[in-house]
Amino acid sequence: MMDQARSAFSTLFGGEPLSYTRFSLARQVDGDNSHVEMKLAADEEENVDNNMRDNGASVTKPKRFNGFICYGTIAIILFFLIGFMIGYLGYCKRVEAKSECERPAGTESLEVEGTEPSETEEYFPEAPSHLFWSDLKTMLSEKLSNTEFTSTIRQLNENSYFPREAGSQKDESLAFFIENRFRELQLSKAWHDEHFVKVQVKGSASNSVTIVGTNSGMVYLVESPEGYVAYSKAATVTGRLVHANFGTKKDFENLNSPVNGSLVIVRAGKITFAEKVANAESFNAIGVLIYMDQAKFPITNAEIPFFGHAHLGTGDPYTPGFPSFNHTQFPPSQSSGLPNIPVQTISRANAEKLFGNMEGDCPSAWETDSSCRLETSRNWNVKLSVNNVLKEIRIFNVFGVIKGFEEPDHYVVVGAQRDAWGPGAAKSSVGTALLLELARILSDMVLKGGFKPSRSIVFASWSAGDFGAVGATEWLEGYLSSLHLKAFTYINLDKAVLGTSNFKVSASPLLYSLIEKVMKDVKHPVTGQSLYRDSNWINKVEKFSLDNAAFPFLAYSGIPAVSFCFCEDTDYPYLGTTMDVYEKLIQKVPQLNKMARAAAEVAGQLIMKLTYDLELNLNYEMYNDKILSFVRDVSRFRADIKEMGLNLQWLYSARGDFFRATSRLTTDYRNAERTNRFIMRDINDRIMRVEYHFLSPYVSPRESPFRHIFWGTGSHTLSALLEHLKLRQENISAFNETLFRNQLALTTWTIQGAANALSGDIWDIDNEF
């Protein structure tokens, strides 16, 4: 049998006889002995061949070359089969692990609460394996079409939730309602944090406005207002009254009568209360009255009270630059943005009483009420008494998060103000309704629709927004180090629907390109046309106002931000008043539900686009235009700069380095391997640095919290440098050359630093600055 088997194998392998060596496994382990045995076997075979030759047998020597080919072929086939099996098993394990990791956002919270795994699997239907951008847009649009925003807005304006002034019981009740709602929506996590902040409220003694006769001493009480202005100086002042239109800097400059030592009365609108008061104080006024004229605010009720604040900044003004946590103990300090003069709101009816004792018609260019007068006569003065007091309150910020599947430590923040001095239907209820419904829809898309955002989505409900974005600012101050290079965009939902005619945007230049794409995708719910109507829309983007919660994100933290609204050419008249109710809102905006859906679609597409794509949709090249525009403006003063023995060469160089850095980053992105997560993350990290590095590192966050050189406030900003340089031509005695030298040098180095940060690692920085 053995001979037959050997004969068969010999035939199979080309007729070559096979030889083998007898040796034990125990000896083979020793290594060298096995070689000896193999050599002996070969010698044995050789001896057999010699003996056969000696015996005269005619035998043909086998061809070993063919055998080697066959052995090699078998080995290759075996290696291929083994490799295939290993790869297949490894792939199965990876798929199993990935399916375990890529659970829907709500799974974590469900397991924490003790839900059985079988229930979880049964609850979530099978989702598509991959969704394209068009699929996501369609899914979002379909879910929005079935959403009744008006019912949510109406619910938020029920008696149980208003009035909800910051720190009140109703504000706290709404906070916990929102937190519980986030949990019901099965977000990855819902939580809140609390801050203890100082706000100003009306004291036990009423504020008052009276007319005093200069000769007779006669006193006539005009009003003890229900409304007030938070953070006013508590004081009593008396003087003549001068009308200063809207209270802008230009309005004060154009007045024929000086306001030094006088009270001023100004119209609401155009700029914030805080800016009006700051301008009045800079022109040495001793007090400010603010009223709503009928021309700009066509409200029938002339007695309506209204509210605002006078802090030229955001956050708790008594912990500037610091978080207002209960366990922090800072030395007594206060913001430089607090006014040093009293300020008070008065009704239109009582403003007209004051005009009855004033002289001179207001200029027709003001386009205000016919009752308007310029200044009190010599026989009368006005006395203003403000008795507001400080009060420490506890506020809650509420959060929910949908964790990302690829980069959970990078997140977009979507927020809305929750509190309101009055009912706050337009001011806070619309934004809060958008926040809740977007959280519901996006969570549902993750749980059931197969949407797997690469990055996290944080939903935030802020308190004390009416006092100057206090809740949002305190959160930024408390977690600034944690948010750095993690929070990459803030989307503000406050006052998103105030009308139907216009779509207005305030945003960081990094978001311009993305906003334009979204505007082209979203149609106006009334006209049916795209929101993108004007190719020149970027030049119409409005700067963030101080009372916009997005402002501290951009100017204080260096986080790109966007705020938008559907509105009219005129201001919404009921903001900050007791008439900001649901009934007035639906009367002003009959298509409220459709407009809210459009606002939610804009915000939803922004969120999805920022979390869906591998590359962050932040167009860093837009800042090239901003820097170039600034350089051109400065270049107009070359002669003045040369007279000071300076030149702009280093500024030109910094601008060139920034341009080259953006070009290099664009090239790196185009050449990057999209499937390499490490490379893509490195590119995204470089993009995230851009906005942050426009925060001037040369000023104190405590003294100048809004450090952004483009969008901040203070002497370090580009606008301040240009304004100061103009003084050299207009009023050289007011020009400070030492200050200007510092401004120019620090601006140049800030731009250079942004260029270096964009370049990446230090060995990639290639400049000759």
From Swiss-Prot:
The keyword Phosphoprotein applies. GO terms for molecular function: transferrin receptor activity. The YTRF endocytosis motif engages the clathrin-mediated endocytic machinery through adapter protein-2. It comes from Felis catus (Cat). This is Transferrin receptor protein 1. Residues 232-322 form the PA domain. The modification Phosphoserine is found at residues 10, 19, 24. Canine and feline parvoviruses bind human and feline transferrin receptors and use these receptors to enter and infect cells. Homodimer; disulfide-linked. Binds one transferrin molecule per subunit. Interacts with SH3BP4. Homodimer; disulfide-linked. Binds one transferrin or HFE molecule per subunit. Binds the HLA class II histocompatibility antigen, DR1. Interacts with SH3BP3. Interacts with STEAP3; facilitates TFRC endocytosis in erythroid precursor cells. The gene is TFRC. Residues 1-70 are cytoplasmic.
